[in-house]
Amino acid sequence: MLESKLENLRQFFGELDRALIAYSGGVDSTLVAKVAYDVLGQNAVAITAVSPSLLPEELEDAQAQAQWIGIAHELVQTNEMANPNYTANPENRCYFCKSELHDTLQPLALALGYNYVIDGVNGDDLRDYRPGIQAAKERGGRSPLAELQISKLEVRQISQLLGLPWWDKPAQPCLSSRFPYGEEITVEKLQRVGRAEIYLRRLGYNQVRVRSEQNLARIELPPEQIQQFVQDVSLGELVQTFQNFGFLYVTLDLEGYQSGKLNRVLTK
């Protein structure tokens, strides 16, 4: 099954002369970039959008991973923070983010002779609330993992099969996803959340989210790590550090980390 899906992915790129990959450095777009490069070689390029919602560490990872693959890698600046429809953080915020991404990449792709902007949306994403997918479709974007019904688990399994060292890399959506819908997003808030998550990663907690609700930080960890976290971490030092970052209050979510938790309000 995995081999057949990998072969389907190779065939997808085999039908193209060139491929431009919207490359975040996550496990999904990294698999897409790897297979595109294996099939097309120098006719494949990965482009990463740089904005305040991208952690500097994630950019460094993307650069290192692209170098490991061998694919040409370029950076572009996106300016979604200048769009009040985005910074107001409505329920369809991701639509405006992906619109900015594709409106930036599509003219570049056409100028360089690429017919499509190709992303790492996977089959599971189609079953979640992802308004950004619609923005990509409206602009002619292609999502081979979704088109071939390759799930997140299969992405990881195929990545492991191909020997990609980061096949089990934790998901790392943009920092704007840390805020409840309706709370305005600012560069300062993004930086505050970013610093807090980097601090926790350096303590050894890689699968972590710092949800920001006004002046309150809510830490989410995998449920099985919560008890150990409370035992091992100096809570007083943690609170002081977070307050230095700009938070007034620091809490630990006892339910633990769950992807898309802030989307619960959409079903009520």
From Swiss-Prot:
A GO molecular-function annotation: sulfurtransferase activity
Database matches in Pfam families: NAD_synthase
Cited Gene3D superfamilies: HUPs
Protein name: Uncharacterized protein slr1717
Similarity annotation: Belongs to the LarE family.
Entry-linked CDD domains: LarE-like (cd01990)
Superkingdom of source: Bacteria
Organism this protein belongs to: Synechocystis sp. (strain ATCC 27184 / PCC 6803 / Kazusa)
